[in-house]
Amino acid sequence: WDVNDCIHFCLIGVVERSYTECHTMCT
């Protein structure tokens, strides 16, 4: 599971999150 993939799916998810939030959750 790639971090960038995780961030991508986080960003396009139902809940809008910032890149920073997604990066924090995915690392």
From Swiss-Prot:
Annotated S-S bridges: 6-26, 10-22
Keywords of the record: Disulfide bond, Secreted, Toxin
Localization terms from the record: Secreted
GO cellular-component term (any): extracellular region
Main localization (coarse): secreted
A molecular function GO annotation: toxin activity
Expressing tissues: Expressed by the venom duct.
Protein family per UniProt: Belongs to the conotoxin R superfamily.
Notes on the domains: The cysteine framework is XIV (C-C-C-C).
Name of the protein: Conotoxin flf14a
